[in-house]
Amino acid sequence: MTEPLRIVFAGTPEFAAEHLKALLDSPYQIVAVYTQPDRPAGRGQKLMPSPVKQLALENDIPVLQPPTLRNAEAQAELAALKPDLMVVVAYGLILPQAVLDIPRLGCINSHASLLPRWRGAAPIQRAVQAGDAQSGVTVMRMEAGLDTGPMLLKVSTPISAEDTGGSLHDRLAEMGPPAVLQAIEGLAAGTLEGEVQDDSLATYAHKLNKDEARIDWSRPAVELERLVRAFNPWPICHSSLNGEALKVLAATLAEGKGAPGEILGASKDGLIVACGEQALCLTRLQLPGGKALNFSDLFNSRREKFAIGTVLGQTADAQ
């Protein structure tokens, strides 16, 4: 009877934890988990373990959290695990060539885009922001470059006009694990060939930045509507209203002309705000100290705040 493959898993956020769950339910042996060091989170800024670390500890899997894999000590620690394969999903650390060379079958990565489009840190949100018609998961063999390795397997899904960064994330987190298991099976059997990426088609998905979430009302409404969806649930698009922060969680396209940021109308259907081209109808908002509400609820209780002619974003936006 052949021994099960010895797999080292490396990942950090919830997207990665979904992949680890599938591997823990597989016939493979997960010998260790690598994840980012605990980070301060929440109002108290307490050190919090990553979702991957929490799952590993619940299943009695050894957890390693080196700040880097570039030094000889960290590489020797990995080599001592004698891995057949390393599976990497949204880990957040660069793997140098010396690490990629350690596992017998190499290292594979599950990336949340249809490579070579959207290499980099935020492929899900950038796909929604760009108005892409589809997204997916690519399982690739890792190289020293960022998301540049040969593609072993791809699965795709349409991006709907209602998709947010959150809804697309959740869908891809379901699609990725079966694709990884299929790729492992093919690699172990020696039946899977990699397809070289066409670098001329590559685009880069820059890391999300809170400053990007500040709404510039001079931009076309079609761009802002996609931005609102892409940045939900994080970092959430925002503006200001009479000097107060205003978070925008949902919006639709609307007709109307006016100065960028000018309130053109308000009803239970939403708050109509002029943009550089067309207008946005803001349908879900959050005011300071309150919870996110549909605009119909705000309109009933705070109608006076949304006077026609008021201009959003005139003062410095709160973070």
Swiss-Prot record:
GO cellular component: cytosol
PROSITE patterns given in the database record: GART
This enzyme's EC code(s): 2.1.2.9
Name of the molecule in the record: Methionyl-tRNA formyltransferase
Native source organism of the sequence: Pseudomonas fluorescens (strain ATCC BAA-477 / NRRL B-23932 / Pf-5)
InterPro entries attached to this UniProt entry: Fmt, Formyl_trans_C, Formyl_trans_C_sf, Formyl_transf_N, Formyl_transf_N_sf, Formyl_transferase-like_C_sf, GART_AS, Met-tRNA-FMT_C
Superkingdom of the organism of origin: Bacteria
Pfam families (alphabetical): Formyl_trans_C, Formyl_trans_N
Reactions catalysed: L-methionyl-tRNA(fMet) + (6R)-10-formyltetrahydrofolate = N-formyl-L-methionyl-tRNA(fMet) + (6S)-5,6,7,8-tetrahydrofolate + H(+)
Its biological purpose: Attaches a formyl group to the free amino group of methionyl-tRNA(fMet). The formyl group appears to play a dual role in the initiator identity of N-formylmethionyl-tRNA by promoting its recognition by IF2 and preventing the misappropriation of this tRNA by the elongation apparatus.
Record HAMAP family: Formyl_trans
SUPFAM superfamilies: FMT C-terminal domain-like (SSF50486), Formyltransferase (SSF53328)
